[in-house]
Every structure is written in structure tokens, then in C-alpha cells.
Amino acid sequence: MTASPAMRSVADVVAGLGSAAVRPSVGVAVDQLGRPGSRHRIPTPALVVDADALAANIDAAQRGADMAGVRLRPHAKTHKSAAVARLQLDAGASGVCVAKVGEAEALAGAGIDDLLVTSPIRPHLVERVADLRAAGVAVAVVADHPDVVPALAGAASTGAPLDVLVDVDVGLHRTGVAEARDSAALAELIAAQPDLRFRGVQGYGGHWQHVADPAERADAVAAGMRRLVECIRAIEGTGLTIDRCSGGGTGTFAVDCELGVLNELQPGSYAFMDQQYADALDGDAAPWRQALFVQATVVSANHDGFVTVDAGLKAFATDAGHPGASPSTYRWFGDEHGLVTQPPDHELRLGDRLELVPPHCDPTVDRYDVLHVVRDDVLVDVVPIEARGCSQ
């Protein structure tokens, strides 16, 4: 991972210690950068990214999108890092997605300037969208209810029209317009505002991403896309044009490419991957590689059959089971600790390092300040997670 104008190097990280972006408690081992074996001398628990696996994942997704003739707009809610976003953009991504306005602000502040906010914008946040646009950031938003349209129009009144997509409920029932006629009415309302520009639709099925059986997953996506197509036809029936049809995810990436309904794909987890995807996709996880780990240290080894490590409930998101520790197993052992069984082929001892696979990558990343980037056994860079905690 090499530095670019929009990417802070480890020197920048160290200079920023004590700032809002990087906290003094990070414990960055600056003197270890580039040294043989430095991967195993990072203060733990720490978030570690395998540079080669990350690069392979980014390349595979971009090649897949290019072969399908669709745009790739990766979701930065996974990595929350301008450095990783820059790698994705350099590989050919058309822009990046963010979940919240706060994430857009953080990444825009680090030089990422083409953003789609994929969660409906609450009226009290539209002024912050206006501020981003005033700063020259190309930001688009989604809407799923007519009541928010006047606020969006008001925020856009001082500049070029704000791009808006209609968010369609394709079966998740979390956000989105449920009925085709309502999607058409909302699109017409958006298009009628001089300060807004209707650009298309978004349809995301998060509930499909971890369906284990490939055939069942494909059938579920196809059914959801039929709902999206119904909305598209209803909107086009009003005379409006659909420029962007955005959605998709990591678990459905291949199906999304094959179906051809979406012309802009939003996978996020593919960059890092996690144990939840490994368990759900099993052999169907290709071409993605595990790139994200939480490195932990054995801090107690006084009992037969297991050791205690310094990564517990605070080190991982806990919504998706236990971290992966193959060939050992991991169990929660408190806020600060985890229990790891002794592996069958060797004995873990006090001070040994382990790299554990997070159960769920997105919220695990949100618990850390920096990514420790490694290649083989060398720590090659440390970059900030600018959008950590930006949940508004």
C-alpha cells in the first residue's frame, strides 16, 4: 500500500497522535515499520490487514464488474478508510458508497470526493449534505418517503441540483419504497424539484448475502430483482429515465453480475471478508480471500487445553458468532479476554501471537483507530480509519 495525496502514511498518523483521527492509545510501533518480523511485534489487540489479500480482492471485484459491463461503487461502511477507498478508486471504481452522512464527511475530508449515501437522509442532516456539496464533493443521496423531498430540495438550492435515487424495498423491509406505484410517485416528486435531479433507484437485499445454498441465494436475488424491475417500469412509465440502478453485495456479487438488472454494484465486505461469510459461503466464497484479522497475544497459559488471549468482547463485533481461530477454537472470556483451545499440532505458550478472523468485519473495524497493513511478516504501513464512529 503506497501513499497518495488522499492517503495518510504512518508518518502522518504519528504526527496526528492525540488528534480526533488517531488517539494516543493506539500504540503505533513506528520503529518496526519495514523490519523483518515486525508483523509479530504490533501492540495487541490490533486490527491487521494483509496487503496482498486486500489487493487481490479489490482486483477480483473490479475485474468481475468490468466483465459484466457494470460500474463498481464499493461500500466504504466496511473499511471506513480513505486509504482503502483510494485503492478501490485507483483500480477502477466509479466512486464509493457510505452508510451515513458522517462517513461521507470523514472520507471527503481525506480526499474521497464521489460518494453515494445509501441510507435515507433524515431532514436535520440535509444541511451537512449541503456543506459537502459546497466543498466540491460529488455526493448523491437516496430517499424513500415524500416528506424528506422538500428538505433535500432546500439543501440543494444554493448549488447544482442534488442527485437523488429512490430507495426500493426488495424484501429486506428495512428501508425503501414497497410498492411500484409509490416509487413512481416519489420519483416524479423528486424530478419536479428544480434543485433535485432524479437519477435512478437503489435496491439492496442484505438478507440474501449470507444464504448458504448458492441456488437458494440466486433464487432469492432473482425474486428481489423482479420487485425492483416492477418499480423501474412504473417509474419509466411516467416518462422519467433510470440512469443508475444501484445495489448488490458481497454474497450476491456473482448473481448480481449475471442477472444484469443492476448497473452499479455496492459490495463492501469483499475487501476484507470475515468468519460469517466464510461460514455461509463455504466453498462458494471464491474469489475472495481473508484479508482482515485481529491480532492477539497469549497473556495466560496456566491450564491444560486452552490459553487466554488479550482480545475479548471489546475487540470484536459480537453479533455473528465467535471469531475464527482455526485449527483452534475461540470462546468469549470477558470484555478483555478470549479463550483459545490448544491446537492439535503445537502448544501455544505465553507471549505467542494469533491472528483471529472477525465474525463480522464492518462493526469490528469500527472498534479500532487504525489498520496495520502487513505483507508476509513485515508491517508495511499504518493508516487511520477516518470514518470510525461516524454513525450520524
PLM feature spans:
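C-terminal accessory subdomain/extension
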Residues: 2-3, 302-392
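Glycine-rich tight-turn/loop motif centered on a GG-T
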Residues: 39-51, 113-115, 130-141, 212-222, ...
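Conserved, mostly hydrophobic/aromatic
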Residues: 54, 77, 107, 166, ...
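Active-site-proximal beta-alpha core segment in soluble small-molecule metabolic enzymes
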Residues: 74-209
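Active-site loop/helix belt of alpha/beta enzymes
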Residues: 163, 169-282
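Active-site loop ensemble at the mouth of alpha/beta enzyme cores that anchors a bound cofactor
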Residues: 217-219, 251-326
